Amino acid sequence: MKILLAIIGILLLSSCSSGSDWTAFVYPDIENIPSADQAHNYTIGNYSTFEECQAAAIERIRNNYATTGRQGDYQCGYKCSRRDDFGGLLICKETRK
């Protein structure tokens, strides 16, 4: 019984700590990429892995292209947070495509 409780406790703790570290940014028009102070308006969600983030962003771009005919762009940011020392900008530790 103690072992079962220990396993459940570990599973609960690991599920709490495995947060959504990746943020997807999708820009619907590649010819009109927003400035850094507007990037927060283009987030589409948070994901546990880069691969999930990338897949969601690409899917959104494809859907946007199908409805608007405009080519978009995306990036995935790792551990993004607003930084007061940068005027409240959303700053990521890393970005990838």
Where do the protein language model's features map onto the residues?
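C-terminal motif of bacterial Sec signal peptides marking the signal peptidase cleavage site
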Residues: L12-S15
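A short beta-strand micro-motif
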Residues: D21-N32
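A short, exposed loop/beta-hairpin motif centered on an aromatic-Gly-Thr core
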Residues: S35-A55
